[in-house]
Amino acid sequence: NYSSATGAIVDRNGKIDNTSIKKIKGRGNSTWGKAKKPYNITYSDKVSIGGMSKGKKFSLLANYQDDSLTRNRFLYDLADAVGTPYASDSRYVDFYSDGYYWGSYQMTEKIEVGKSALVNDIDDTAYLDADGNVNKNFPFLCEVDSGAVDGEDYYVKCDDGIKVTIKAPELSEGDKGYNEVKNYVREKYNAFHRAAKKADSDLSQYADVDSCAKLWLINELGKNWDSGVSSVYFVYKQDSDGNYKFFGSPVWDYDNALGNATGSAWDLQNFGVKDYTQYSGWWCRFKDRQKRTQNSSNIINNISRNTQVNKAAVNIWFEQFVPAINYFAGKTASYKGSDEFYTKTQYFDLLKDSGAMNYNCLLYTSDAADE
């Protein structure tokens, strides 16, 4: 369910934007059950928040499971810095509702398609031709999501029982092309999935290798607990040569990453990592791997072992990731990859006042703090 609302965006200089809120709705799966709730917000007109590009639809992330409140923003910004397509921009905000302070949140571009949306080169109607018939080929946005639920999500079950939610075009039963779109997405994802399971396959026939390599490296660096399980997005569209392929992006949902997933400690010890907060050791390559056959149905695991991806990843890591990480760590004085990627000290300064108020003014702490 959703509600309309009046709202005010107040910048750091006290300037007020009173653009009305068309819809505000609870979001998230497990996160909705937490004390600090996340939301999706749709404004009646385009707004800019903290210098972000103007848009109508935003996700208000609670980051309740992350005591630092910053893992999502750091990895989103890193993804943007290394050239991952459709990296979501975001800002730290203080959220009030009905006069009550709810905490420090991360206001981020919502994963949507459309001319003014995050995925701005496809839209919900691209699957239909001029006569209203389903095209032979068409772009779509999908998410690998093990938590997809019948009756709530528009999804298909693919090889190995993998659930793939169709985010765009997002259709309801009875809509034109409802079943045709499901069959098309299943066919294309299965072909990609089967190719990814073979380390020596020509994955470039099915996917954009560079974006898949970056998606893997973001998850690998972050030791993302949900890697390949949920919130794994792919955009299926034409490349520069006109061939339809899967692009690994947008990146999403990293509050249980960078040493924050208590549940990963046992797994990491099996991989030779004694302390799950360490950055050393492989993660994605072992995630969901079957002990007897060493095979995996986890898409990020399979991508990480593909020969083409590994070859591309070497250059991407040293030419794009390493300069960004060195700048973040304060090892280099400047960085040309992005104007919105910062040093660890700068990230702290961006968040410190809002973060301090989050914990000083509220009675709840995160699950991680409770444990």
Identify the residue ranges that each predicted region occupies.
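Internal "kinase-insert"/substrate-recognition segments embedded within catalytic cores
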Residues: V47-S48, A62, G83-S88, Y100-L217, ...
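A short, hydrophobic C-terminal helix/tail in secreted or cell-surface proteins
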Residues: D367-E371
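Conserved oxyanion/phosphate-binding beta-strand-loop segments in alpha/beta enzyme cores
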Residues: A5-D11, I16-A62
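Middle-to-C-terminal accessory/interaction subdomains
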Residues: K34, I166-V229, K237-Q238, N243-V251, ...
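A conserved alpha-helical element in kinase catalytic cores
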Residues: Q65-T84
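Structural recognition of the beta-strand scaffold that forms the well-ordered cores
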Residues: N40-T42, S59-A62, D94, G103-M107, ...
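Regulatory N- and C-terminal appendages and interdomain linkers associated
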Residues: N1-K15, M357-S366
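A short glycine-rich, hydrophobically flanked beta-strand micro-motif that places a catalytic Asp/Glu
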Residues: S88-D94, G228-V235
